[in-house]
Amino acid sequence: MEMASAFTLNVRLDNIAIITIDVPGEKMNTLKAEFASQVRAIIKQLRENKELRGVVFVSAKPDNFIAGADINMIGNCKTAQEAEALARQDQQLMAEIHALPIPVIAAIHGACLGGGLELALACHGRVCTDDPKTVLSLPEVQLGLLPGSDGTQRLPRLIGVSTALEMILTGKQLRAKQALKLGLVDDVVPHSILLEAAVELAKQDRPSSRPLPVRERILAGPLGRALLFKMVGKKTEHKTQGNYPATERILEVVETGLAQGTSSGYDAEARAFGELVMTPQSQALRSIFFASTEVKKDPGSDAPPAPLNSVGILGGGLMGGGIAYVTACKAGLPVRIKDINPQGINHALKYSWDQLEGKVRRRHLKASERDKQLALISGTTDYRGFAHRDLIIEAVFENLELKQQMVAEVEQNCAAHTIFASNTSSLPIGDIAAHATRPEQVIGLHFFSPVEKMPLVEIIPHAGTSAQTIATTVKLAKKQGKTPIVVRDKAGFYVNRILAPYINEAIRMLTEGERVEHIDAALVKFGFPVGPIQLLDEVGIDTGTKIIPVLEAAYGERFSAPANVVSSILNDDRKGRKNGRGFYLYGQKGRKSKKQVDPAIYPLIGAQGQGRLSAPQVAERCVMLMLNEAVRCVDEQVIRSVRDGDIGAVFGIGFPPFLGGPFRYIDSLGAGEVIAIMQRLATQYGSRFTPCERLVEMGARGESFWKTTATDLQ
């Protein structure tokens, strides 16, 4: 049976050819290798029809033009040569589209990403809708790749090299008006007239390219180009720490095309694409992409979720305000905030106002839409308006008695079906539910700060939580734009449990004489977004260390912080950035203020600040403890699978994405090598480095995590 075509051709009475893109059976249009023959057959028909005046590419999908290439197609390549051949095939196809003698216009609505934007770039003109769903980008770098279908060559010539480099090196998304301003599209119109606007453009001569801004013209010349690539190369190296080879290859390929011409550029692009597909970094980044896609499809349990029409939040502090924002503005659900005083409610409302007003200032949102979203949030100092809320999220202080009181109040003031979700970071959910009359409707829902930026949430059912409560909470998290993982109700859950020994070891090295900035720089070089000491300052030293006694009580001395160090720091009123002094000192400009290490920290903790360890040695000590604890979490079924463990670490604490997560990283090193490193460290520094039993067994059998069956807690 012949597969239905993803590209269909219809010729209008006015001799404009409409090519409709609609991948059968898929929500998103993605480009597959087998589509090349379909497009070539259409191009042949276009060339043979001498009456045609123009061509328009348009999508039949309601919210996307083309969302990029099918990643599975790339993963099926066994060699760099196969991947290079794939790129050359795509390049040839784009060249054939561009070589058509009549105007070819892309009519863009929704996501136009990767290969979709490269197809649009091969057209002679582009029109897009003013809908918020319409975004244009080349995100291949986020998968450890570069655009392989002429994108590195066409984009710099269209919008200028410096602007193009920013897009290609970061995967930055452009909204419609930004794209128009930069010259990436020729017009922005309402969705209702998109096709007609594109047809009108196709009836004219090919759109003439806009003259580039003076700055871009200067940078396109040999001297300007040399200076630009030197500066961008330096900045990129600092940002990536040399851990992402794709960025280096992007710079090389773009510069080759500008210096030696498009033919050399296309050749360099295809070769670089093929080589990057085979790098371990790209394979790890693609594994994270697939894992996160799977997690987003996971319903959490087999039970159907209950309806979600409105949500209540207890506590208007930093977390409560952030949760209210994502619930109203991402999930689109009415939110009622309860706080014991009006100031707390005002704080939460201001939190959402600040987020939305920032979008209005950046022209990402209309003022009317801001007001519409804000209208979903209301506040109260009692339980008025809570009677029919489907789910209540508790975000009050980390105090067990207080949280148990909140459960009792919700059961008294809300409907019988209402779910109680606690945002605790450390308290057992079973204890919070201990006195509940409906314990099956109590669950943990652990957000990370700042709520609007951190993609992960941990969903923590206790032993008596119902399957429907799990499914409903997972459903809410997805509506909020989060990636949820379901974890077992054990001390520290998953993310904080693997993070604590990592931070403890950093503090221990401080007491041994390593310098603050050396420890942080070592872990940034390893691939973390910030070092462990800076992370503690950002979270708040008082907040970040609160969980250590809980973990020590549950799991023993391997979670012990260096004696008296934490108490010495807290007794000196050092909380981190939030009060201007921690391990670092901060200026008065809030989160953007510059920081510098406070030299007084060393005598305070009885350290010299004259280290002897190299950066790799520092990183090794912190990371190995994290890996060991992650393996224990699999063994104890704290996480349902190694997939969830990798996602949790990457999305929750910034474990280097190019390593694929703790379990992918162990597999890449080999369990035997990890065991050998840990045993060496145990001999040097103590029994906390002793490899756990599960890891030793895997090493003996030569097993790897991603080739064994994932465990399931249910």
Curated annotation (Swiss-Prot):
Concerning PROSITE patterns, the annotation shows: 3HCDH
Q: In which pathway does it act?
A: Lipid metabolism; fatty acid beta-oxidation
Keywords of the record:
Cytoplasm, Fatty acid metabolism, Isomerase, Lipid degradation, Lipid metabolism, Lyase, Multifunctional enzyme, NAD, Oxidoreductase
What are the annotated GO cellular component locations? cytoplasm
Gene Ontology terms describing biological process: fatty acid beta-oxidation
Q: Does the keyword Lyase apply?
A: yes
Catalytic reaction annotation: a (3S)-3-hydroxyacyl-CoA = a (2E)-enoyl-CoA + H2O; a 4-saturated-(3S)-3-hydroxyacyl-CoA = a (3E)-enoyl-CoA + H2O; a (3S)-3-hydroxyacyl-CoA + NAD(+) = a 3-oxoacyl-CoA + NADH + H(+); (3S)-3-hydroxybutanoyl-CoA = (3R)-3-hydroxybutanoyl-CoA
Instruction: State the InterPro entries in the record.
Output: 3-OHacyl-CoA_DH_CS, 3-OHacyl-CoA_DH_NAD-bd, 3HC_DH_C, 6-PGluconate_DH-like_C_sf, ClpP/crotonase-like_dom_sf, Enoyl-CoA_hydra/iso, FA_oxidation_alpha_subunit, FadJ
Q: What are the residue positions of the site described as Important for catalytic activity?
A: E118, E140
GO MF terms here are:
3-hydroxybutyryl-CoA epimerase activity; enoyl-CoA hydratase activity; long-chain-3-hydroxyacyl-CoA dehydrogenase activity; NAD+ binding
- Please list where the region (Enoyl-CoA hydratase) is annotated: 1-190
- Map out region (3-hydroxyacyl-CoA dehydrogenase) in residue numbers: 306-714
Give one Pfam hit by family name: ECH_1
- Annotated localization: Cytoplasm
Q: What is its EC number?
A: 4.2.1.17, 5.1.2.3, 1.1.1.35
Known function: Catalyzes the formation of a hydroxyacyl-CoA by addition of water on enoyl-CoA. Also exhibits 3-hydroxyacyl-CoA epimerase and 3-hydroxyacyl-CoA dehydrogenase activities.
UniProt similarity note: In the N-terminal section; belongs to the enoyl-CoA hydratase/isomerase family. In the central section; belongs to the 3-hydroxyacyl-CoA dehydrogenase family.
Q: Which NCBIfam families match?
A: FadJ, PRK11154.1
Listed under subunit, the entry gives: Heterotetramer of two alpha chains (FadJ) and two beta chains (FadI).
State the protein's name.
Fatty acid oxidation complex subunit alpha
Give the organism the record lists: Shigella dysenteriae serotype 1 (strain Sd197)
